[in-house]
């Protein structure tokens, strides 16, 4: 059988901006037979995420993710349906997910590398397992639980940068659920600001491209900032940190403004901002959700419950077609998405 796949065509360079042309689509032969323990799956949805920018470099700069290889199939979060199985615990028609799903229309995988998912947890919206009820949602929930030091009724103010993205749009809502009295989002368009306050429960939103961020932050956070969920790094984070209170906490989720630059992760703070951090005893620790695998199952159930109760509002931006993976990635890296950026490969979930 002939199937389509996406491979890494070129690297943008450590300081380069990724473009759609860094990827290319090609056809490949898929064997007709599968071996014991394997399954043949049809890809339904694929995820593009900021961390993938590191995988485009020859050296990712981390020990927990490997680089993509030139002319080899690209992989990441994915959801699919099993079409044929020779694995004892997986049967035809099961929906499965993996963090290392090849960007390919159909693929033969080791069944042990897949996790079965229950469509009832997402009311049939399978793509949510790649977003708010998947790794981004878990990153937001566990990050806030482990590093935010929020308790019910603690009257804390939380600021979220990259607030209209996959993690940020969920993190702000969770901040309220867990006890923050005020949540302020920072994002890059007027449309996103309106969405945050009108649909996602943020108390205020700042457009960093138009507003004076320092001024708007003082207005929106009159009592200062107690918790900062940092998705972007760079100048925005410097501005937020300068308005943080004593003994406050930074949840270091991502640094998308720095991902196209050859700097260590997390990037060091400037001397002036580092001095503020030390003076005010602000904690700033790298947070890696993969270190909390024991919390994944209860976390998914909690996120699903909030969603089913109508409390957790889920936003996603969907592009159709494997041929658009590169365009979707480029768009996500430049803020073209609201909520989770998803690529729909096949919507046909019947066999």
UniProtKB/Swiss-Prot annotation:
UniProt tissue specificity: Widely expressed.
UniProt-listed Enzyme Commission number(s): 1.3.1.48
Subcellular location: Cytoplasm
Record's function text: Functions as 15-oxo-prostaglandin 13-reductase and acts on 15-keto-PGE1, 15-keto-PGE2, 15-keto-PGE1-alpha and 15-keto-PGE2-alpha with highest activity towards 15-keto-PGE2. Overexpression represses transcriptional activity of PPARG and inhibits adipocyte differentiation.
SUPFAM superfamilies xref list: GroES-like, NAD(P)-binding Rossmann-fold domains
Stated name of the protein: Prostaglandin reductase 2
Similarity field: Belongs to the NADP-dependent oxidoreductase L4BD family.
Pfam families: ADH_N_2 (PF16884), ADH_zinc_N (PF00107)
CDD domains in UniProt: PTGR2
Organism: Homo sapiens (Human)
Protein residues bound to NADP(+): 165-168, 192, 208, 231, 253-259, 287-289, 337
């Amino acid at each position: 059988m002939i199937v389509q796949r996406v491979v890494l065509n070129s690297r943008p360079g450590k300081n380069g901006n990724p473009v759609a042309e860094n990827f290319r689509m090609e056809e490949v032969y898929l064997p007709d037979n599968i071996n014991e323990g394997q399954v043949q799956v049809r890809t339904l949805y694929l995820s593009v995420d900021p961390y993938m920018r590191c995988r485009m470099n020859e050296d990712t700069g981390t020990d927990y993710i490997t680089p993509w290889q030139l002319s080899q199939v690209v992989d990441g979060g994915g959801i699919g349906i099993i079409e044929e199985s020779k694995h004892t615990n997986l049967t035809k028609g099961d929906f499965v997910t993996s963090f290392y799903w090849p960007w390919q229309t159909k693929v033969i995988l080791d069944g042990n590398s897949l996790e079965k998912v229950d469509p009832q947890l997402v009311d049939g919206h399978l793509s949510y397992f790649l977003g708010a009820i998947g790794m981004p949602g878990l990153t937001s929930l566990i990050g806030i639980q482990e590093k935010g030091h929020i308790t019910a009724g603690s009257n804390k103010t939380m600021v979220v940068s990259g607030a209209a993205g996959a993690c940020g749009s969920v993190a702000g809502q969770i901040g309220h659920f867990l006890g923050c009295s005020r949540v302020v989002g920072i994002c890059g368009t007027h449309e996103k600001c309106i969405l945050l306050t009108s649909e996602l429960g943020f108390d205020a939103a700042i457009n960093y491209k138009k507003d004076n961020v320092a001024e708007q932050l003082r207005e929106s956070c009159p009592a200062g900032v107690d918790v900062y969920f940092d998705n972007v790094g760079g100048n925005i984070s410097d501005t937020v940190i300068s308005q943080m209170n004593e003994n406050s906490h930074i949840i270091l989720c991502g640094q998308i403004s720095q991902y196209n630059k050859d700097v260590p992760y997390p990037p060091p703070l400037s001397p002036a901002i580092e001095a503020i951090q030390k003076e005010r005893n602000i904690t700033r620790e790298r947070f890696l959700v993969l270190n909390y695998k024991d919390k994944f199952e209860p976390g998914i159930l909690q996120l699903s419950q909030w969603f089913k109760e109508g409390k957790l509002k889920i936003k996603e931006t969907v592009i159709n077609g494997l041929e658009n993976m590169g365009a979707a990635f480029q768009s996500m890296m430049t803020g073209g998405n609201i909520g989770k950026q998803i690529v729909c490969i096949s919507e046909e979930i019947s066999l």
